[in-house]
């Protein structure tokens, strides 16, 4: 209440809302080339833990949202990207962040999607992150709580990736709908719109228009 952020609190049911929300987002973004995650979805719906007392959470807490001290990289001096911040279960927030955390002994297929230097020498394992978090807060995180948080976090990450995949396919579909001839027509319309007083495209505008057209033509046929 003192922070003035009480409006972010939607009340009890945070875990249920998160699970249901990401099931819905994945379903809406699903394309024919991916699975339905039916077993994972059923498990998440059936194994939701008792919620802990809510706290202010970042909701996108991961390594590449941290600012480290240049002189001492083990010291965090800032946390970025608070636009998703809310009031909810911090265990779920940590599990979501650890979905990005590939450690040095993870198998090759996991290493292939690593985006952060979490496998570098000296970096903590996920076990060590959980232990440090529990010790810092003076709490015990049960194995079932941790498992649920990590499964949810991985499913959430799959949902994010699928949303991006869907957006890319949708954008490409719009481009393909124009066809090669459509690109030519759009280029001519742009030329006309950008024409100078002498009736011809100005030099820089002409370069932009034809660079755009030439870049798209190999994709559109």
PLM ranges: what are they?
Residues 177, 187, 193-195, 201, ...:
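Short linear motifs in low-complexity or flexible loops
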Residues 216-220:
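Short, intrinsically disordered C-terminal tails of secreted or membrane-associated proteins
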Residues 183, 208-209:
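Hydrophobic alpha-helical signal/anchor motif
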Residues 181, 198-199, 214-215:
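Residues at flexible loop/coil and secondary-structure boundary positions
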Residues 42-98:
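Active-site acidic catalytic loop and adjacent metal/ATP-binding pocket
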Residues 1-38, 48-55, 84-90:
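A cross-family kinase active-site recognition segment
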Residues 9, 141-152:
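All-alpha amphipathic helical-bundle segments outside canonical DNA-binding/catalytic cores
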Residues 92-138, 152-168:
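Active-site activation/catalytic loop segments of kinase-like enzymes and analogous catalytic loops
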